[in-house]
């Protein structure tokens, strides 16, 4: 997942280390 939307963060917390919005 690229973008780090609220829904993405909820499902993929590891995305926080890649990109946060």
Swiss-Prot record:
- What is the originating organism of this protein? Apis mellifera scutellata (Africanized honey bee)
> What is this enzyme's EC?
3.4.21.4
Give compartment(s).
Secreted, Extracellular space
GO-annotated molecular function: serine-type endopeptidase activity
Q: Which GO terms describe its biological process?
A: digestion; proteolysis
Query: Enzyme class, one word?
Result: hydrolase
Principal place of residence: secreted
Q: Does the keyword Calcium apply?
A: no
Record-given protein name: Trypsin
Sorted alphabetically, the Gene Ontology cellular component annotations on this record are: extracellular region
Q: Which reaction does it catalyse?
A: Preferential cleavage: Arg-|-Xaa, Lys-|-Xaa
Q: Which family does it belong to?
A: Belongs to the peptidase S1 family.
Q: Give the UniProt keywords, A-Z.
A: Digestion, Hydrolase, Protease, Secreted, Serine protease
């Amino acid at each position: 997942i690229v973008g780090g939307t609220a829904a993405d963060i909820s499902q993929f917390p590891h995305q926080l280390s890649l990109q946060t919005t």
